[in-house]
């Protein structure tokens, strides 16, 4: 026979009411008491009856996650944060991929409504504001990484301006004074915000990032390779901020082929901290980390608060951090630049 909540209460030495509060994360109690209840439930392989709970709470303990334009490189860490924050005991996650198809998106919204999900997280490949979902949906919606163009919606995204500032600061810390930037398409919001951050850091040091030292192109290795060759043939630079790790790897390959020493002659900082690329680059690529796993956790926590009736409208931004490797190894003295537990910053 499956264990009941009375069995949990008896084994943990608490009342049924206390056991219920401990399992549902409700009420005030000592942390060790709550942990004892959870440990006991795990030992007895207790599985709560969600159908019974739904009758009293009106909840289904399911949350949807809708990707509007397919699964990209940034989806897995964000998804991992969402899943770990919700956990098996809090809610199940239903994944839906709209693939840039409005009909498919509408279908999934209908399915999620029919399944009576408690809430929905919407994400995408870019941070650019996206058209909002209908506000008539019967559940709260939170936008993660991608943002809603409606300021009344709840959005959590990356602070790309801060990331650009961090990258330039690291190059300055390395001793660089003539810094170039090779990045993605100027049409991308994140590209423009990162440039603004880099220029702010350089201005604080009495320097500038002139337009002739900024190169735009696809987020690809060949962009970095070709731009670096052209740059080194015409300009004297001692640091390059790369708009992605793929671009950074292309830059490193080009510099290596020209006999340019990294970081002695030219230091490099990438963006994304895509470890598969950054660690395979020679030398290892220092990179800005967008803390996407943490962003996923924060998104799930914010959605749960909205489900409880406490929405948090507006756009909030998660600061970035640095992963230091051999391409720009200057030590960091400010620990907030490499810790990923910075608080969310609301838009002004």
Model-derived segments and their meaning:
Residues 1-60, 345-348:
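N-terminal helix-turn-helix DNA-binding module of bacterial transcription factors
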Residues 16-21, 55-71, 178-185:
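Short beta-strand segments enriched in small/hydrophobic residues
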Residues 31, 35, 44-111, 115-118, ...:
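Amphipathic helical "hinge" segments at domain boundaries
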Residues 50, 68-77, 95-104, 156-166, ...:
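Hinge/beta->alpha junction and helix N-cap segments in small-molecule ligand-binding domains
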Residues 100, 122-166, 246, 272-285:
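Flexible loop/hinge segments that line or gate small-molecule binding clefts
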Residues 116-124, 180-182, 214, 235-246, ...:
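Periplasmic-binding protein-like
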Residues 234-348:
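Flexible loop/turn connectors
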């Amino acid at each position: 026979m499956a264990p009941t909540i009375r069995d949990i209460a008896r084994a943990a030495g608490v009342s049924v009411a206390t056991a219920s509060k401990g399992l549902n994360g409700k009420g005030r109690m000592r942390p060790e008491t709550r942990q004892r209840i959870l440990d006991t439930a795990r030992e007895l392989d207790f599985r709560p009856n969600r159908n019974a709970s739904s009758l009293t709470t009106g909840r289904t303990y399911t949350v949807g996650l809708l990707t509007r334009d397919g699964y990209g490189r940034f989806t897995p860490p964000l998804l991992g944060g969402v899943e770990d924050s919700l956990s098996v005991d809090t809610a199940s996650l239903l994944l839906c991929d709209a693939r840039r198809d409005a009909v498919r998106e509408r279908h999934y919204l209908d399915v999620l409504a029919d399944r009576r999900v408690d809430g929905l997280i919407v994400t995408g490949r870019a941070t650019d504001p996206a058209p909002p979902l209908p506000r008539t949906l019967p559940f709260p919606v939170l936008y993660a990484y991608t943002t809603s163009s409606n300021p009344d919606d709840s959005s959590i995204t990356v602070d790309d301006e801060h990331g650009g500032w961090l990258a330039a600061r690291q190059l300055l810390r390395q001793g660089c004074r003539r810094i170039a930037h090779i990045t993605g398409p100027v049409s991308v919001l994140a590209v423009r915000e990162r440039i603004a951050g880099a220029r702010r850091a350089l201005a604080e040091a009495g320097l500038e990032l002139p337009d002739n030292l900024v190169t735009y192109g696809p987020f690809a290795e060949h962009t970095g390779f070709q731009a670096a060759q052209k740059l080194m043939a015409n300009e004297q630079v001692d640091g390059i901020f790369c708009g992605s790790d793929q671009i950074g790897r292309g830059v490193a390959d080009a510099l290596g082929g020209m006999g340019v020493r990294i970081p002695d002659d030219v230091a490099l900082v990438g963006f994304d901290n895509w470890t598969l690329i950054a660690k395979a680059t020679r030398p290892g690529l220092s990179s800005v980390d967008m803390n996407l796993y943490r962003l996923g956790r924060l998104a799930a926590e914010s959605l749960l608060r909205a489900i409880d009736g406490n929405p948090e409208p507006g756009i909030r931004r998660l600061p970035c951090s640095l992963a230091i490797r051999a391409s720009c190894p200057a030590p960091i003295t400010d620990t907030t630049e490499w810790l990923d537990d910075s608080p969310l910053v609301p838009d002004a």
